Swiss-Prot record:
Domain FAD-binding PCMH-type: 244-422
Protein name, as recorded: Probable aldehyde oxidase 2
Keywords, in A-Z order: 2Fe-2S, Abscisic acid biosynthesis, Auxin biosynthesis, FAD, Flavoprotein, Iron, Iron-sulfur, Metal-binding, Molybdenum, NAD, Oxidoreductase
Xref: SUPFAM superfamilies: 2Fe-2S ferredoxin-like (SSF54292), CO dehydrogenase flavoprotein C-terminal domain-like (SSF55447), CO dehydrogenase ISP C-domain like (SSF47741), CO dehydrogenase molybdoprotein N-domain-like (SSF54665), FAD-binding/transporter-associated domain-like (SSF56176), Molybdenum cofactor-binding domain (SSF56003)
Organism annotation: Oryza sativa subsp. japonica (Rice)
Region annotation Disordered: where it falls in the sequence: 544-577
Length: 1355
């Protein structure tokens, strides 16, 4: 290699204390890929590949032999490259605790606080918490905590998981588990857990009852032998080392800037084949579409990691991590501290720990990355030092950003930030607007302002002497300074006319490029931030009494309440920094014990340790191949040819599986909903939607398959094809619909025309729209197909429909059903997305494995999954409604179009669900025309509460429209039109059940008519009167949800040692199915035991779903699978009890194990299979609930903070209150995402473009209600239901519309404040989702200008 580089040596790392040499590893290998393919570790998961979800978080430890110090930090293993980790130690969730060595306190507490459902996110969650604990405990300046606690504060505990995504739990129990370690927490405030019984007089919260925590030192993250090896290698290096160290194949580690440049001069590579890396976090934003041959690791160049402080300021080396920069700047002056505060909201902690300051700025300069850091440092007057070859120069950051994009030879050495000291004349503020307050989201706009000013003695306002105004992320190539505005402001005394003119000038400066999303909103944000800044320098602007104009650094939802507000209203605090509080109320029953007990979810500790096995955790069989979809990007076109952009990609491809590879006698079928229709597996011969599967690339590794699929070049032709139908409007124009079978069609009620004739008031052609929602299960679609003898095949699939998957795969291959075996142990989140859509992956794997006669595995990358998934149905509704002057509704008619996509899937089922949820109110007469539109987009499918979520919201939109028209309180309209039992029976028929079970009126009155609600509503009104730029709203929403009971099988087998194996048709997808089934098994067999069966729970194992073992398994969905599975198991147990009773009676009261031994000796059959079917007269029932939500809207930015949500849900006699509580909270938060911030966007061809964690934002810990209260009530007994229980999985999602309704009330208050904001101040259409841009638009994009104009006019 020449004198510039040594011979390559293998990368040496330790994983959980075990030493590994990475020999023959591709240089582009990530740590996650290495862990999952070269070690036994399976805890870290691939959730996104972007550093945006936290599923892959590990702890990395580095040893400084000179200082004899170990530093450790959390990191995203999906982004961290293995080649950069030579002589590092890696600790995963298995490494801190496991089933053999004992679980760690973090793992046990996550389990005990019921904080793990599907469990796919839990190992990463575990490591984020562990890392935060270890970091706090290492801080010597903090006081020692009481025994059992850590040095972590409760606020830090919450933020520890702010970058980790969870789609199941709603975060509240995770936050409680985190806070249980904090010394400043009140344990009584923590939620339901397995360690003490809340509210019990004899069971007080006590740290001694929690799993013991003794500090981070209990886990050795860096083994001594590796320290010795490092010291030894240093000794060898001192004896004469080559200029540049080399590890692996193609990794170079220069130690100086000179060595870096000599590498380029040595002709070892060309610039196009080399990648410069320090942390590689940028690849989460800009995914490499090809692999690089060479990598230069600049993180070991000492000069680039130096930090120099002086009286002039601080110079930060380019490879200093963001977290280190925050630490350094936090210890400086006022400007430095505000910069640090802003930086703390950039990315998650596990990205901040590795991402570098220089890397962020380089991305802004080269790739137009919307950097917060560049904007803030630009405003602070920063300079950068760069070096090209032998030439080093220091230029302003502004100059650097304006230069042509840097090439690979240009090295950013450092960034210098001047020290502005403690001059009272200096004001520095920074702002950002993003969907997540704590930062795990790119800004819509970021800005930073620095002014030198003096106070004018006569007016009290500031005279601006000099000013810097920086704006970024608004749609320009890079952050800019608003020079024209700066020049205008210099020498001006800040006043309303001056601010108004500055704002007008700014609108000509901040100009988003064509194609930028929400351009008007971004300009309005920039105006709002300049207004906030300048208002802080002004005096005498007319404000309401007690008003507070929000200003300050990083105002993500900054809220200042009225001074007269009560503490419960959180007055005078920043609402984004409020601690999350909660309350849970429920009734526990011993009647059917252990059924009804809030026991921990089965397998939760295994999930936390990473030992729970998902499909992609199954070890790859010998000769396994890997697949990735090539999908169409055109909605309607002939596929002419498939090629690959690079020769490397084509070299890695073994074959491409297409429709021609389906076996003779097989069908091109990817999914099939019984009696409704099929969907093709492969394009043949015409692509019918963007995202359709053209073929499957097969390669030797999953990475090569991904790479080749991304490099695929498709030749299209649209000759002789009609233009695509993409929208509901297109479908209506072309009369393109799917039929709804008569047996699925909902039934109208009454005479609408007669009802309208009786109305005092009418609304004609009201309209509302609802967009789609992506499932965002943490585990993407995955399958492993293993061919077997005699044309048989076994597939491990993450599926909610194993039986239908088996049938479809068999049809696709042209073989009998019994030749196909589908095995599903657990699913990493489903929500309906692992129903029909999972079948495509299974069938594609099966075709490939069948043809190649080798195992084939597929694990979809997040982008492909999002593009192909389909998601929730978009809908457009027009309605006409008549009502009396007192608010009583006489009749409703609505026309609804839903976008079903290219195939029926489950779409024809949705009309009855839409109408079912909408019928929660007595509409008098109800008629409708529902069209299921056939379009050239991916098929929409069932997503949690399909149709019901939309139908319930449509009802609320109509009711709010009525209330607005009559100028009355919306709750009065709601209450007046709730059913009595007679009308309920008319609208719902047999589902209404008995009068005693109708609890909705009681629930609604409990909330909406309570004195507390009236007081809170008055306080909201008081707050709004005293605050111009913050408005609050409060709303109470009732729900009704009709669920269906389905036949379900169950099998119970008692082993000779007394252990019990149980099989059910349902699949464990995180909903607690296994836990409830175990409880039911113990209860049903309990009459054979002295303790009533409680001792049997630990003897029960529920085993994986297997279609050859458990036929007629049905499907997991519709919220009732758990209860019907329990009933099937109870039926099986009843037969076993009858057989065992004679043995028990003959032997007296033998212990369980002895009883089974005697039965076995007597040849008693110890297994029983049952197939439970519901009573034909009771196949469905209604679920009821209500929720009050209170929100605060920032009129200037559109940001919404959910201050409080109170949920009351009728759970019947809960089979497991802890599981049901988790379902209620998780569904509610998923609903918050649907109604407020999950923006599902497509391009002009219908291709999904919000296709990753960077652009699609599900709720996070910082976006859930600050006060989150849930009460589960037990309604009247109904023994027609399973032990009087009720469903909990889907209905509570509908309650989240209360947040949307509260937002509407807050916006209405803003529109009253600024009358005439684009129309009537009271009546307006607010579609779903109500994202920040939508909220701001409804509040008024020009409220600042209109306010200033009105103020100036008064003056």
């Amino acid at each position: 290699m020449g004198s510039e580089a040594a011979a390559a040596r293998p990368v040496v790392v330790t994983v959980n204390g075990e030493r590994y040499e990475a020999v023959g590893v591709d240089p582009s290998t990530t740590l996650l890929e290495f862990l999952r393919t070269r070690t036994p570790v399976r805890g870290p998961k691939l959730g996104c590949g972007e550093g945006g979800c936290g599923a892959c978080v590990v702890v990395v430890s580095k040893y400084d032999a000179v200082a004899d110090e170990v530093t450790e930090f959390s990191a995203s293993s999906c982004l961290t490259l293995l080649g950069s980790l030579h002589h590092c130690a890696v600790t995963t969730s298995e490494g801190i605790g496991n089933s053999r060595d004992g679980f760690h306190a973090v793992q046990r507490r996550l389990s005990g606080f019921h904080a793990s459902q599907c469990g796919f996110c839990t190992p990463g969650m575990c490591m984020s918490i562990y890392s935060a604990l270890a970091k706090a405990d290492r801080c010597s300046s903090r006081p020692s905590p009481p025994p059992g606690f850590s040095k972590l504060t409760a606020a830090e505990a919450e933020k520890a998981v702010s970058g980790n995504l969870c789609r199941c739990t709603g975060y509240r129990p995770i936050v409680d588990a985190c806070k249980s370690f904090a010394a400043d927490v009140d344990l009584e405030d923590l939620g339901l857990n397995a360690f003490w019984k809340k509210g019990a007089d004899d069971e007080r919260a006590d740290v001694g009852k929690l799993p013991a925590y003794s500090g981070g030192a209990a886990v050795c993250t860096f083994p001594e032998f590796l320290k010795s090896e490092i010291r030894s290698s240093m000794g060898q290096a001192n004896g004469g080392a080559p200029a540049v160290a080399v590890t692996g194949d193609g990794w170079f580690h220069p130690k100086s800037v000179e060595e870096f440049h000599r590498l380029f001069d040595s002709n070892l590579f060309d610039e196009r084949s080399v990648k410069i890396v320090a942390s590689n976090t940028g690849s989460g934003v800009y995914k490499d579409q090809d692999l690089h041959d060479k990598y230069i690791n600049i993180s070991q160049i000492l000069e680039l990691s130096a930090i120099n402080r002086s009286s002039k300021g601080v110079e930060i080396g380019a490879v200093v991590s963001i977290s280190k920069a925050i630490e350094i700047l936090s210890d400086g002056g006022a400007v430095f501290r505000k910069i640090a505060d802003h930086l703390s909201k950039v990315a998650s902690s596990f990205v901040q720990n590795t991402a570098t300051i220089g890397g962020n700025i380089i991305m802004a300069q080269r790739l137009s990355f919307p950097s917060d850091i560049a904007t803030v440092l630009l405003a602070a007057g920063s300079t950068v030092t760069i070096q090209v070859a032998a030439k080093r120069m220091c230029i302003t950051l502004e100059e650097f950003l304006k230069q042509p994009p840097c090439d690979s030879r240009t090295l950013l050495v450092s960034i210098s930030i001047p020290d502005w000291g403690s001059d009272d004349g200096i004001t520095f503020e920074s702002f950002r607007a993003a969907p997540r307050p704590l930062g795990n989201a790119v800004s819509y706009v970021n800005s930073a302002f620095l002014a030198r000013s003096s106070v004018d003695g006569s007016s009290g306002s500031h005279l601006i002497e000099d000013v810097c105004l920086a704006f970024g992320a608004f749609g320009a190539e890079h952050a800019i300074r608003a020079r024209e505005v700066e020049e205008f402001l210099k020498g001006k005394l800040v006043s309303a006319p001056v601010i108004l003119e500055a704002v007008r000038l700014l609108k000509g400066v901040v100009s988003p490029a064509e194609g930028t999303t929400h351009p008007e909103y971004r300009v309005s944000l920039a105006v709002s931030y300049l207004f906030r800044f300048l208002t802080s320098l002004a005096n005498g602007l007319d404000e309401p009494e007690n008003a507070n104009v929000p200003n300050g650094s990083c105002t993500n939802g900054t809220a200042n309440g009225s001074a007269n507000s009560s503490p419960e209203k959180h007055s005078n605090v920043d609402s984004s920094d409020l601690p999350i509080k909660s309350r849970q109320e429920m009734v526990f029953s011993d009647e059917y014990k252990p059924v009804g007990k809030p026991i921990e979810k089965t397998g939760a500790e295994l999930q936390a340790s990473g030992e729970a096995v998902y499909v992609d955790d199954i070890p790859a069989p010998k000769d396994c191949l890997y697949g990735a979809f090539i999908y169409s990007t055109h909605p309607h076109a002939h596929i002419k040819d498939i090629n690959f952009r690079s020769s490397l990609a084509s070299q890695k491809v073994i074959t491409v599986i297409t429709a021609k590879d389906i076996p003779t006698g097989g069908e091109n079928i990817g999914s099939c909903f019984p009696m409704l229709g099929d969907e093709a597996l492969f394009v043949h011969p015409v692509s019918e939607f963007a995202g359709q599967n053209i073929g499957v690339v097969i390669a030797e590794t999953q990475k090569y398959a991904y790479m080749a699929a991304k490099q695929a070049v498709i030749e299209y032709s649209t000759e002789n094809l009609q233009p695509p139908i993409l929208t509901i409007e297109d479908a209506v124009q072309h009369n393109s619909y799917f039929p709804v079978p008569p047996f699925l069609a909902p039934t109208p009620i009454g005479d609408f025309n007669q009802a309208m004739s009786e109305a005092d008031h009418k609304i004609i052609d009201g309209e509302v729209k609802l967009e789609s929602q992506y499932y965002f299960y943490m585990e993407t679609q995955t399958a492993l197909a293993i061919p077997d003898e005699d044309n048989c095949i076994t597939l491990y699939v993450s599926a909610q429909l194993p039986e239908i998957t088996q049938n479809t795969v068999a049809r696709c291959l042209g073989i009998p059903y019994h030749n196909v075996r589908i095995i599903t142990r657990r699913v990493g989140g489903g929500f309906g997305g692992k129903a029909m859509k999972a079948i495509h992956v299974a069938a594609a794997c099966a075709v490939a494995a069948f043809k190649l006669r080798r195992p084939v595995r597929m694990y979809l990358d997040r982008k492909t999954d999002m593009i192909m998934a389909g998601g929730r149905h978009p809908m457009k509704v027009k309605y006409s409604v008549g009502f009396k002057s007192d608010g009583k509704i006489t009749g409703l008619h609505f026309d609804l179009g839903m976008n079903g996509g290219i195939s029926p899937d489950c779409s024809p089922v949705l009309p009855v669900a839409i109408v079912g949820a909408l019928k929660k109110y007595n509409w008098g007469a109800l008629s409708f025309d529902i069209k299921v539109c056939k379009t050239n987009v991916s098929s929409k499918s069932a997503m949690r509460a399909p149709g019901d979520a939309q139908g319930s919201f449509i009802a609320e939109a109509i009711v709010e429209h009525i209330a607005s028209t009559l100028s009355v309180d919306t709750n009065a309209i709601r209450r007046k039109n709730l059913h009595d039992f007679e009308s309920l029976k008319v609208f719902y028929g047999n589902s209404a059940g008995d009068p005693s079970t109708y609890s909705l009126v009681t629930i609604f009155d409990k909330l909406a008519s309570s004195p507390e609600y009236q007081q809170r509503a008055a306080m909201v009104e008081h707050f709004n009167a005293g605050n111009r730029w913050k408005k609050r709203g409060i709303s109470c929403v009732p729900i009704t949800y009709d669920v269906r009971l389905r036949p379900t099988p169950g099998k119970v087998s008692i082993m000779n040692d007394g252990s019990i194996a149980v099989e059910v048709g349902g699949v464990e997808i995180g909903q607690g199915l296994w836990t409830k089934v175990k409880q039911m098994t113990a209860f049903a067999l309990g009459q054979l035991c002295d303790d009533g069966g409680e001792g049997l729970i630990d003897k029960v194992r529920v085993i994986q779903a297997d279609t050859l073992s458990m036929i007629q398994g049905g499907f997991t969905g519709g919220s009732t699978t758990s209860e019907t599975s329990c009933e099937a198991v109870r039926k099986s147990c009843a037969a076993l009890v009858e057989r065992l009773k004679p043995i028990k009676e003959k032997a007296g009261t033998p212990p369980w194990k002895s009883l089974i031994a005697q039965a076995s000796m007597a040849s008693v059959k110890l297994t029983e299979h049952a197939y439970w079917t519901p009573d034909p007269t009771f196949t469905s029932y209604l679920n009821y609930g209500a929720a009050i939500s209170e929100v605060e809207v920032d009129v200037l930015t559109g940001e919404t903070t959910i201050l409080r949500s109170d949920l009351v849900y009728d759970c019947g006699q809960s089979l497991n209150p802890a599981v049901d509580l988790g379902q209620v909270e998780g569904a509610f938060v998923q609903g918050i995402g649907f109604f407020t911030n999950e923006e599902y966007t497509t391009n002009s061809d219908g291709l999904v473009i919000n296709d990753g964690t960077w652009t699609y934002k599900i709720p996070t810990v910082d976006t859930i209600p600050k006060q989150f209260n849930v009460e589960l009530i037990n309604s009247a007994r109904d023994h027609k239901r399973v032990l009087s229980s009720k469903a909990s999985g889907e209905p509570p999602l509908l309650l989240a519309s209360s947040v949307h309704c509260a937002m509407r009330e807050a916006i209405r208050a803003a529109r009253k404040e600024f009358a005439g904001a684009g129309g009537s101040p009271l009546t307006f259409q607010m579609d779903v989702p109500a994202t920040m841009p939508i909220v701001k638009e409804l509040c008024g994009l020009d409220v600042v200008e209109r306010y200033l104009e009105s103020f100036a006019a008064k003056a």
